[in-house]
Amino acid sequence: MSFWRRLFGGATKETLKPQRLDYLNEALALERQGDFEGALTSYRLALRDKPSDPRILQDIAIAYTKTGQYEEAIRFYRRALSLDPTLVGAHYGLAFRLKERGEHAEAVEHLRAFLARPPKGQDADRWVRHAEAALRELETVAPEQP
């Protein structure tokens, strides 16, 4: 439909359908550009459309990690895992956030869950080696004090 037709009333209700933005892809693009705050906004909008999508929750947790908001990251990793306990990326991310907080026993659980179902792909070996090294380190640390 041309600009002139729209301007002079040639458009009908059927021809002017609002288009839904793809907030998830927008968030991923913003994150690739390094705009993590913008990505978080778009992720929240995507979550509003799909509140039970564990991958969106995991992506939000990753963005929070990249902005240094570790407590929020932990909260979103936990929410993602409550919806999908097999989400290995969430186990990986949560394990390292917990390790940094000194919650070693729970970090070990999540590292083991990650390593039980390691991801496949070009970069996967790097993440698996990192998780294995962290697990070895945590298993040699003295148990947490109650």
Locations of the language-model features?
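Conserved structural position within tetratricopeptide repeats
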Residues: 45-48, 78-82, 116
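Alpha-helical segment of the N-proximal tetratricopeptide repeat
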Residues: 16-52
